[in-house]
Amino acid sequence: MKTKVAAIYGKRDVRLREFELPEITDNELLVSVISDSVCLSTGKAALLGSEHKRVPDDLENHPVITGHECAGVIVEVGKNLTGKYKKGQRFVLQPAMGLPSGYSAGYSYEYFGGNATYMIIPEIAINLGCVLPYHGSYFAAASLAEPMCCIIGAYHANYHTTQYVYEHRMGVKPGGNIALLACAGPMGIGAIDYAINGGIQPSRVVVVDIDDKRLAQVQKLLPVDLAASKGIELVYVNTKGMSDPVQTLRALTGDVGFDDIFVYAAVPAVVEMADELLAEDGCLNFFAGPTDKNFKVPFNFYNVHYNSTHVVGTSGGSTDDMKEAIALSATGQLQPSFMVTHIGGLDAVPDTVLNLPDIPGGKKLIYNGVTMPLTAIADFAEKGKTDPLFKELARLVEETHGIWNEQAEKYLLAQFGVDIGEAAQ
């Protein structure tokens, strides 16, 4: 099977590549990858090349396919797997294999990654339960289950303690104060959505950022009134220019501090502020992944000793987290499409991956069977004045107030003749 992929060839070197895939073995799957949402971690891998923990050497001869937030359709089933999978079945990939090497789809394999028209899912990923049946029909939601799974996993990874009781109570504190720092970006939107609609029931959620435009957008998507209807106080704060942001934020809790803090940017000042905002037994989750292996900040160990403050770090999520993300999206409790601001085809991947930090907006969603420059959803109407494809896409997203949706996805895929398979039984 001939495939077209976006692959890392070295530091800051991402190219389109077209080649013939080898025949699958009896324990492998050949799949068509319909959609892949671009992760900032992919950009980090492209920036570092083989210096990245998950990226192997010899990229020049064996370039690795980018992308891991993906979903698609099974095209061919190895003969030993016919009792478990079938041709035409839709799937979602859970890329976190937990291997000692750190290797995973989108970083480490020549034939296994989400930015591909076709890829081979290897035996090890299948044995680890990484191929999940998808019962839905909206591939964007399936792709976005992976970033939502990471967000959900972070909430589950936080923990709290009782003095002299040597057990960790996993999860955020019920009825507690949550602070989401640097959290008005695409992943932050998902984090706010889960805090309000995921059933974890904090009493207060404070969203902190320094970008008025991003804060205004997320407030439209997840308004204060929506949270209030669920018994949650939601507060949006721009700390830019504040003389004492720590005092201002602590005042929102009556100077008690925050029980759970999530840091969504690897910026030393943000991490230091998080430390100062912790309540007694407060848990700081360093969600943002730094590229600097020597990323260090001062930390108050007096509070660690006397106030039981503590730190966790999370990267990725479990299969159960993925299943939770899919289920909550299917019922409409979570709206992962809120995160999407740009749509593009496979041809847009190299530039998108290499320039991701400089492209404004939220998640960039790629459809591998489509040829289309990366385009902001907000620009569809203008482009539609001269292009009938964008004219219809603009009409379809207007029905959901500018949010990407299943009807727009189906129309786009149909225009390029993409086979979308059938829902898993």
Model-flagged regions — what are they?
Residues 1-66, 400-425:
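Short N-terminal strand-loop motif that marks the start
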Residues 278-280:
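Helix-to-beta-strand junctions that scaffold the AdoMet/dcAdoMet cofactor pocket
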